[in-house]
Amino acid sequence: MKLFEDKSVEFHKRLSKKERSDGGVFFTPKDIRDIVFEELGDFEPTNILEPTCGTGEFISDCRKVYKNSRIIGVEIDPRSAELARDGSKNEIIVHDFMTWDTDEKFDLIIGNPPYFTRPTGFKHDPSVVKCRSNICIEVLHKCITRHLADNGMLAMVLPVSILNSKFYTPTIDLITDTMDVVSARAIKKNNFMGTNVRVMVFIIRKRTPGFVSKYTFKTSLGKVIINPDGERLGSIVSGKKTIGSLNVNISFGVTLASVKEYFVDKSCSGSFPLICYNNIAKKGDLLFVSDKYSKKRFNGRAILIPRGYAHGDYSFNFIDYTNDYFIIENHVIAITGEDCVLDIIAKSFADHRTREFCRLLCSSGDISKDYVKEIPVFG
């Protein structure tokens, strides 16, 4: 299978690494584009919008699949736009999609929006993100609220990590409150040029009566979570209490850089351990810190789990740890509370279903405090 058109490969080669990174320019391979159309099924749109069309890979596919549809592409880079026009066969508008406007509503909005964080000082819209805005989320939100027809479908290739970022909850909540999640199909391996970010095929439409998505589940607190394995997660958590229902504190730790100057030998008087990710995941040797370091100290008992990293698979593990004093690094999460509650948690965490639940829930490779609260308690 030819993954990219020649024009895209040549254009990609001409871009510097900085241009690709700053602009989030990573073209979608054919095998993933095919999955998008597979998930759309027999949907027949009258008009189609690709909001950040690049060199027009999706537009070329749409022209073959939807022969009678009107297709519009919007692209900020005139060089990409010229390639997307393909000898004037396609209607391509050179414009920043975020400031582009039209009264037309579209039956299908399709594409792979760029993914990059806005620079420091950018004034974010609190109805879109909490902070640290990302162009990908802005494009998604604008498509939903300004351009999607009432009976339309939005089909995009998006990073799986957007689903559990606390920064993007305003837009994710908009989706769970007003939209049907038709697909959130995770792509385990991909052939993107220049990036290995984990992605999903994400398809939504405006809420329809009686629709039940296999890509969402409702927590014990009533929150709806979107996940590629939503159906299985819902069955695991059904009827169970969760960590969030127990009287515990959930804490992150400190960065290694902030504590590095306080490292000492464990024989040093008053020193105490720093528990790192590897001490839980790989049972590595402990580091020790001088008693001159006083921030975020724990004393007594805690259940410690790896926070993980935003890539790869999340692998759950835990240690039931007790010491007079200790601190944890920021890739570790501490759960503290009364011994009787920690006994319940330790027993539950030893259950194989906890490992499965966390692996499926943490599809982006790491776990948040909010997700820790959703871990079911097994008796």
Swiss-Prot record:
Catalytic activity entry: a 2'-deoxyadenosine in DNA + S-adenosyl-L-methionine = an N(6)-methyl-2'-deoxyadenosine in DNA + S-adenosyl-L-homocysteine + H(+)
- Enzyme superclass (EC): transferase
Q: InterPro entries under this entry?
A: DNA_methylase_A-5, DNA_methylase_N6_adenine_CS, N4_N6_ade-DNA_methylase, SAM-dependent_MTases_sf
Name its species. Paramecium bursaria Chlorella virus XZ-6E (PBCV-XZ-6E)
Sorted keywords for this record are: DNA-binding, Methyltransferase, Restriction system, S-adenosyl-L-methionine, Transferase
User: Molecular function (GO) terms listed?
Assistant: DNA binding; N-methyltransferase activity; site-specific DNA-methyltransferase (adenine-specific) activity
Which family, according to UniProt? Belongs to the N(4)/N(6)-methyltransferase family.
Protein name stated in the entry: Type II methyltransferase M.CvrRI
Q: Which domain of life is it from?
A: Viruses
- EC number per UniProt: 2.1.1.72
GO process annotations (BP): DNA restriction-modification system; methylation
